[in-house]
UniProtKB/Swiss-Prot annotation:
Superkingdom of source: Eukaryota
SMART domains, per database record: Knot1
One GO process term, biological-process aspect: defense response
Lineage: Eukaryota, Metazoa, Ecdysozoa, Arthropoda, Chelicerata
PROSITE patterns on file: LCN_CSAB
Tissue: Expressed by the venom gland.
Pfam families, per the entry: Toxin_3
Signal peptide: 1-19
Record-given protein name: Toxin To14
Role description: Inhibits voltage-gated sodium channels (Nav).
Signal listed as a keyword: yes
Chief location category: secreted
Family: Belongs to the long (4 C-C) scorpion toxin superfamily. Sodium channel inhibitor family.
């Protein structure tokens, strides 16, 4: 039984595990600015943007007027605590 568990752990480490996250996408990690959206859009813009970032889906979160994505890859930049820095290139 222990041998089987060891093989399973080695298999996971060897082939990796793809994790996904739900969060606000940002244009670049350095700028940390959420993507604005039109709250009257029928969620088409954000869904297309999120799918372009390889997410499962997305919508315009109306209270923040920002796109929110479901199922983003782990390496996709998302909003962190801190302010937006629009002047950073």
């Amino acid at each position: 039984m222990n041998c089987l568990m060891l093989i399973f752990v080695v298999f996971l480490l060897a082939f990796g595990v793809e994790c996904k996250k739900d969060d606000y996408p940002v244009d670049t990690a350095k700028r940390n600015c959420m993507l604005d959206c039109n709250v009257w859009d029928d969620e088409g813009y954000c869904d297309k943007f999120c799918k372009g970032r390889k997410a499962d889906s997305g919508y315009c979160y109306k209270l923040k007027a920002a796109c929110y994505c479901y199922g983003l890859p782990d390496d996709s930049p998302t909003k962190t605590s801190g302010r937006c820095n629009p002047n950073v290139r």
